[in-house]
Amino acid sequence: SMEAMKKNSQIFQTIKEKSYKASEELADKFGEPEVLEGYGRRNTTTMSVAPTKSSSVILGQVSPSIEPLKANYFVRDGAKLKSTQKNRFLESILQERGKDEREVWDSIAQKDGSVQHLDCLTDEEKEVFQTFSEIPQMAIINQAAQRQKYIDQAQSINISLDPAEVPLEDINELYIQAWKKGVKSLYYQ
């Protein structure tokens, strides 16, 4: 959505500005390295963005950075712990509507974490709670391209495609568009 694109830009512009400011403060305190003399900064680069799935699991109830959620409800099967994970924002809406019930969550699980079948959600809410595979993958490319101008290194961008279901020409087009839009790297499918 346009709102998501605007927020994406605001967030990464703010991160860039704050990281540059911090680098300037470090340069004031510790001096500029020889390679950066005259730039007023301590660091040559300040940002590289990766999906942080493992870190988000360890920290609990935080997002995996730029990575869309794979499901709104799933069982996380770790080496030492098996736990059920619910999208807490979705859970809050369901509670407000008196729909935070086992039957509803079971239906979400049966649909691979999707909520598109739930009549109790508005169309806008269904759009907000799309899973990684439900989001048009070009939208992920477009958001990555939009924020790249604020990132001085690169982003680790994952796309969710099933090569058995998506024609090779469509996959190729995603990669070409990403390259044309200045996205430096794409990973996993």
Question: At which residue positions do the language-model features occur?
Answer:
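Internal maturation/activation junctions in enzymes
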Residues: 1-52, 123-127
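Catalytic alpha/beta core of large soluble enzyme barrels
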Residues: 47-189
